[in-house]
């Protein structure tokens, strides 16, 4: 069912080195919206309505009073993004690991859904998954 007024999602995550993070994600095929990108933030485009704001730790602290999570020892969350095929899952994760990311989990095949995950250079956990459209109920 189409949403009348789709909401835009901006996921904000802190990064230690903005240039390194942007280069990493550009290497995975993502682009950045220059309107919301500067020396303190990179607006990575996931879709027409989904974005990931890579914020320098200093900029991130302007939005939250809580301590920034040490991703070497703690999970702050799990970012899951869908792709069009199992092959795209494998390709994206392999590229992530060869361009500065780290292996997070082994591939998981549930038949109707397949996923694999990596850690970006700042330790954020990314799950890349494919789901068989025939198994997704329309609401």
What is each stretch, according to the model?
Residues 12-60:
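Core segments of cupin and vicinal oxygen chelate
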Residues 1-22, 78-81, 132-139:
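N-terminal beta-strand motif that seeds the catalytic metal site of vicinal oxygen chelate
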Residues 60-67, 136-138:
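A short, acidic/glycine-rich surface segment
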Residues 2, 7-16, 44-45, 67-139:
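Vicinal oxygen chelate
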Residues 53-55, 80, 129:
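Residues in well-ordered beta-strands of folded domains
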Residues 27, 31, 36, 71, ...:
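Charge-dense, helix-prone N-terminal extensions
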């Amino acid at each position: 069912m189409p949403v009348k007024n789709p909401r835009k999602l901006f996921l904000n995550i802190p990064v230690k080195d903005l240039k390194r993070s942007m280069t990493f994600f550009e290497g995975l095929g993502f682009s950045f919206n220059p309107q919301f990108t500067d020396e303190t933030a990179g607006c990575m485009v996931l879709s027409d309505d989904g974005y990931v704001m890579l914020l320098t730790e200093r900029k991130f602290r302007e939005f939250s009073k809580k301590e920034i999570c040490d991703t070497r020892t703690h999970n702050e969350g799990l970012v899951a993004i869908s792709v069009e095929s199992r092959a795209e899952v494998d390709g994206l994760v392999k590229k992530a690991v060869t361009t500065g990311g780290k292996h997070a989990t082994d591939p998981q095949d549930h038949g109707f859904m397949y996923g694999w995950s990596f850690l970006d250079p700042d330790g954020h956990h990314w799950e890349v998954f494919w789901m068989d459209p025939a198994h997704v109920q329309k609401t």
